[in-house]
Amino acid sequence: MIHSKKLFLFYILTLIFIISCNQQQTRTEIKTIGVVDMKLTSPAFANNDAIPSEFTCDGADVSPPLIISDAPSNAKSLALVMDDPDAPVGTWDHWIVFNIPPSTKQIAKGTEPYGVAGKNSWGRTGYGGPCPPSGTHRYFFKLYALDTELNLPEGATKKDLERAMKEHIIAKAELMGTYKRTR
């Protein structure tokens, strides 16, 4: 009888512990979800749509216009990365800019935002538009809000940027466009 009471008490305490852990995990998930409201859009193409050829190697190869909204008020800087994970040699970096002022609301067509330019996979700074060798590729424009300005030189690589941003990202927004050459 005493053994069954102890066993019953053990089961009840275990159940209470599991329920409280589950509730704590749910609260953490909700808190994390509520942090990211920042948005990155473009008037040139919608998320998951084709990027117009004007912004590619088949056109003028200029950067598309981008609109930034709802950046966190406590952000000290923004970082922008555009890459292509479908490249045959692995992810190809098209555009890297960091230490963008957090007050930036738009990046006009064909311009570089105020900030520090990183080095793309062509080994140069600045925008390099989509130019897939074959098939449809996805191009991710990733915007990061950071709680600090980064101490990196011009020409830093995406790997350098990712290392420096670690532990400093307070929000992220993403815009994805596709492109297929029609040669």
Mark where each language-model region is:
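Bacterial N-terminal signal peptides that target proteins for export
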Residues: 2-9
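Bacterial N-terminal signal peptides
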Residues: 10-18
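Intrinsic disorder/low-complexity segments, especially N-terminal tails and targeting/processing regions
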Residues: 4, 18-20
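N-terminus-centered regions that define maturation/targeting leaders and the start
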Residues: 21-183
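Generic detector of short alpha-helix boundary/capping microenvironments
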Residues: 9-10, 36
